[in-house]
Amino acid sequence: MAKTNKQMIMSICNDINKKEGEGAVYSLGSKHADLKINRWSTGIEDLDAIIGGGMPEGRVIEIFGPEGSGKTTLLYHLASLQSMALDIPIEGTFDADRAKIFGNKPKQLLVYRAKFGEDAMNKTLRFAKAGIPLIGIDSVPSLIPKEDAEKVLKSSDKDSIEEQRIGGTARLLNKYLPMIEEIIEVTGTTLIFTNQVRDKIGAMMFGEKTDTPGGRRLKHSCSIRIQVARRAWIEIPNKNPHNTANSEKVGFIMKCKVVKSKVSNPMGECEIPCFFDRGFVSFDQVKPIRNELMKLRAQKYGKRIPKEDLEDEEESWEEEEDGR
């Protein structure tokens, strides 16, 4: 057994705290060990519940899922809750009208169109130092270093291009995330990445066949990773004479699963209804909103709505065939 010199250990602790500030080294049970995690509500009760009471300040969050699952939609919603937020849509797909639907306002939501991965990361550092409450990067696969982007343009090998993109993104995050984490821990900025699901390169017959771009660094840095999927469409009878579909999709049910959490118990799940014209709502609101939309469509197209449609007790939605 090692010979422990407690007096020397305490002397070292005191010296470190004197040079680096009180609390640089502390023991279990001290006031520094019991610091409360500052959080802000997502405005969605069920989502708050599965992430421990709200989004933590000064942490890295990842929202990932397949295309059309609502990643950007959720990011717009979360940005609208802040006094100021920065959206970095590297994919070039920023939708001002959709951002407004979720409550974002002029001068409250800033948008920076990054050309290359370094642009996005450097602006993230600058705005985080200024203490902006939220930064959203949409999305990880588009975080390509300038040098790698130029190589991709010159390459004709599809597999080589994909490997170049994935490797470049991982290297970029390895370089910048440690600096960003150190800054946001002090300023309280919440950094949210949206990410996609990709087939694993060289995946074996057994085990996970899919993964998310960004490498291990992003996964390690995240305090919360939320997997989202579109479980079902919310529909109403179609009254548009120019549309031959039987029903009109007016929203969807988003399924959220916490696959990693450093600030709460992981693996919690919830489902959230979202309407395209007004954003996220509770399940109690689904039926009244559907009835309202049916009446509006009937007035617009001069169609009568059968009474049984309005009195239907069951919300109408269509399950996704692939279970997403």
Predicted regions and their residues:
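Phosphate-binding/switch region of NTP-binding enzymes
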Residues: 166-278
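Helical mechanochemical/support elements of P-loop NTPase systems and associated helical scaffolds
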Residues: 5-8, 12, 39-46, 56-59, ...
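Structural signal for conserved beta-strand scaffold positions within catalytic alpha/beta enzyme cores
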Residues: 27, 87, 111-113, 193, ...
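C-terminal regions of RecA-like/P-loop NTPase motor modules
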Residues: 1-27, 231-324
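A short acidic, often aromatic-flanked loop/helix-cap motif at beta-alpha or helix-coil junctions
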Residues: 33-34, 116-120, 233-236, 280-281
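Conserved inter-motif catalytic segment of the P-loop NTP-binding fold
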Residues: 77-78, 82-175, 179, 297, ...
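The Walker A/P-loop phosphate-binding site
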Residues: 2-109, 122-129, 296
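Conserved, well-folded catalytic cores of nucleic-acid-processing
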Residues: 15, 19-23, 50-54, 66, ...
